[in-house]
């Protein structure tokens, strides 16, 4: 069973992000806009209830998270990914740190950069053109996310689905 943990924003902000993703993100149909808290990890099916309990325990002291998408940014030159940058807060960092440890399916490969991906799988020329447009359009969105979502990847459908949500705090 392949799982991941993410913060999923309100439907209205998902719609705003998806307006870009429909055009510029080749993973648009695979997953909704989100902030990755724990990248994909694999468990045995019989460990599912243990994982749910572990997630509940790890978030019990973490309050709902304020998310502020502040501007368009990118991961170039490492990869041609464009995203809406989310201001890193203590509570976001705490949530990330709870799940990126050796005792919970390993430490993250990359530093924590909270964001909503809006474009990926681009050529260098596409990247330059799209980044310029998106940067000009800008973003300034705030909301409080009260749930951590547990997602499961279906290899058959090549898609991520929310299978459980956990209330923060």
Swiss-Prot record:
This protein's record includes keyword 4Fe-4S: no
Domain of life: Bacteria
Entry's EC annotation: 3.1.-.-
Hydrolase found in the keyword field: yes
Active site: 34 (proton donor), 115 (proton acceptor)
Keywords assigned: Hydrolase
GO molecular function: hydrolase activity, acting on ester bonds
Classification via Gene3D superfamilies: Cyclic phosphodiesterase (3.90.1140.10)
Motif HXTX 2 per UniProt: ranges: 115-118
InterPro entries according to UniProt: 2H_phosphoesterase_YjcG-like, Cyclic_Pdiesterase, YjcG
Motif (HXTX 1): 34-37
Family to which this protein belongs: Belongs to the 2H phosphoesterase superfamily. YjcG family.
Cross-referenced HAMAP family: 2H_phosphoesterase_YjcG
Name of protein: Putative phosphoesterase SE_0715
């Amino acid at each position: 069973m392949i799982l991941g943990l993410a913060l999923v924003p309100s439907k209205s902000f998902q719609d705003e992000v998806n307006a870009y993703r429909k055009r510029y993100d080749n993973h648009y149909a695979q997953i909704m806009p989100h902030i990755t808290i724990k990248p994909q990890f694999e468990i045995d099916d019989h460990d599912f209830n243990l994982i749910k309990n572990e997630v509940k325990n790890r978030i019990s002291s973490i309050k709902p998270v304020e998310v502020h998408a502040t501007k368009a940014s990118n991961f170039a030159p490492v990869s041609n990914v464009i995203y809406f940058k989310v201001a890193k807060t203590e509570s976001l960092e705490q949530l990330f740190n709870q799940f990126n440890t050796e005792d919970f399916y390993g430490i993250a490969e990359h530093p924590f950069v909270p964001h909503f991906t809006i474009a990926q799988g681009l050529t260098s020329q596409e990247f330059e053109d799209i980044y310029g447009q998106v940067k000009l359009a800008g973003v300034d969105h705030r909301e409080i996310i009260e749930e951590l979502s547990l997602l499961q990847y279906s290899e058959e459908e090549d898609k991520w689905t929310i299978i459980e949500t956990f209330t923060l705090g």
